[in-house]
Regions:
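A detector of single, family-specific signature residues
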Residues: 1-452
């Protein structure tokens, strides 16, 4: 007897009558339209031509596609060259999909040209065999440009601090082994004094502030070296670059705060009548529940205010793009691919995903792992049998699931389940028997009494 399983088609898998596809390059794009033949039923006609990647040429293309009543335009995501085509065609009111170039490759063994690639992309489009990539709305894209630049400048500022540390090592100064923060108040004062010409280790050690004062003897030893004039000149350049980046980061933060405040206010989910009541009282209660998304995301262990801003910039506020938390996790590449062949199934790699989002979630997972919370306990449970890296990925996935629920429901708030959630609820009898056996093995006579 055959094991027959019926697999239903996806809702979007339907033949489209009029489609267009754009194979993008740096200076131009190869456009292909597929429409029904004017006189022969069932026959389709492909038209291929090249369009310059300039604004006026793309606007003219948008008008032409609109006149042809194109139902969907698919743009291949090649580097950043897709942006002019996607933005201008979208602004014209066309239905534009951005598709992953890795998922639309032609059949191996066939000739590869831009013209054939455009035709192949159009054929996939008309048969509904493509999945659109997530492209947030314009206001979120603007916010994302600021947050990503802030991340990049913060990393570059850290590199300048590392270069300064290497410079001090070249000058035989071991300041970073005593001071945990080289760019803190004490470390900065000592470096400025070195640049100004001070070479006496005792005078430099006297510049220590706060808890670093108790390490006076260690500072004298660490500040004994050969700091020359050329070291001072290079250190001055590095500090100036560091300060300039700090100013730019502060400007970006102020702009990001403004853009976050201009985002549309969250609305309670449909069917939420918990705020109903006597007129304005119910509305006031509902407004009090709808805290800003940044504040609600900040309640998650490991996610700070800047991290919450980056999450909104990368994911947006509309979670209808991701029907379930599993869809968001899959899109973020935080779940391993399942590879099944014959009777064997194994887990593949998670994939690259969004580097800014995955980087933030990795840092948040590492920070949450050190806390006495549910997420911290989850990490400690998994690290014993899975290792550190897999445990961190699992915690990052849990954080992303929490984020989806908070963004999908503006009235939701994060509530920590506590570090003892698993130990007090899962297999309690089995754990009790195990502890009793261990005590008996040590020679104890155990009598269990239920606590009142």
């Amino acid at each position: 007897m055959k094991d027959v399983q019926e697999i239903p088609d996806e809702e979007h898998e339907q033949v489209l009558s009029r489609v267009a596809a754009v194979d993008v390059a740096k200076a131009s794009g190869m456009v292909c339209t597929r429409v029904p033949h004017a006189s022969t039923p069932g026959r389709r006609v492909s038209t291929v031509w090249q369009v310059s990647a300039t604004t006026n040429a793309i606007l003219a293309l948008a008008d032409e596609l609109a006149e042809c009543d194109v139902e969907r335009v698919v743009v291949e995501s090649t580097s950043d060259y897709w942006r002019p085509f996607f933005y201008l065609l979208e602004a014209r009111g066309l239905s534009v999909w951005l598709v992953n170039a890795h998922q639309v490759k032609n059949v191996p063994g066939r000739p590869k040209t831009d013209k054939l690639d455009a035709v192949w992309l159009a054929k996939l489009t008309e048969r509904g065999m493509l999945r659109p990539s997530f492209v947030p709305p314009a206001e979120i894209r603007e916010l994302r440009d600021y947050t990503r630049l802030r991340v990049d400048l913060t990393r570059e500022r850290s590199r300048h601090a590392q270069r300064l540390e290497k410079l001090l090592e070249d000058a035989l100064l071991k300041l970073s082994t005593v001071a945990t923060d080289l760019m803190g108040v004490s470390g900065r004062a000592m470096i400025e004094a070195l640049i100004a010409g001070e070479r006496d280790p005792r005078m430099l050690a006297d510049l220590a502030r706060g808890r670093l004062r108790v390490k006076h003897a260690a500072l004298i030893e660490a500040l004994t070296g050969r700091f020359d004039d050329h070291h001072g000149e290079l250190a001055r350049m590095l500090l100036d670059c560091y300060d300039a980046l700090t100013v730019q980061i502060e400007q970006l933060t102020a702009r990001i705060d403004t853009l976050i405040g201009q985002l549309p206010a969250a609305q309670p989910p449909a069917g939420d009548d918990s705020g109903d009541g006597d007129g304005d009282g119910g509305a006031a209660a509902a407004e009090a529940r709808l805290l800003p998304a940044v504040e609600r995301l900040d309640e998650i262990p490991g996610i700070g205010p800047r991290g919450a801003q980056l999450l909104i910039a990368e994911l947006g506020l509309d979670m209808t793009q991701f029907p379930t938390a599993g869809h968001l996790v899959s899109w973020s590449r935080l779940c391993p691919r399942t590879i099944q062949s014959g009777t064997k199934s194994r887990s593949g790699q998670t994939g690259r995903g969004n580097p800014y989002l995955k980087g933030l979630l990795g840092e948040a997972a590492a920070a949450a792992a050190k806390t006495d919370t549910f997420l911290g306990a989850r990490y400690r449970r998994l690290v014993k049998r899975r290792g550190k890296l897999k445990a961190l990925v699992a915690v990052a996935r849990s954080i992303l699931v929490i984020i989806w629920h908070l963004l999908a429901d503006p009235t939701a708030r994060y509530h920590d389940l506590g570090p003892d959630y698993h130990t007090s609820r899962i297999d309690t009898e089995r754990k009790t028997r195990g502890h009793v056996r261990q005590l008996q093995a040590l020679g104890y006579d155990v009598t269990l009494t239920v606590a009142a």
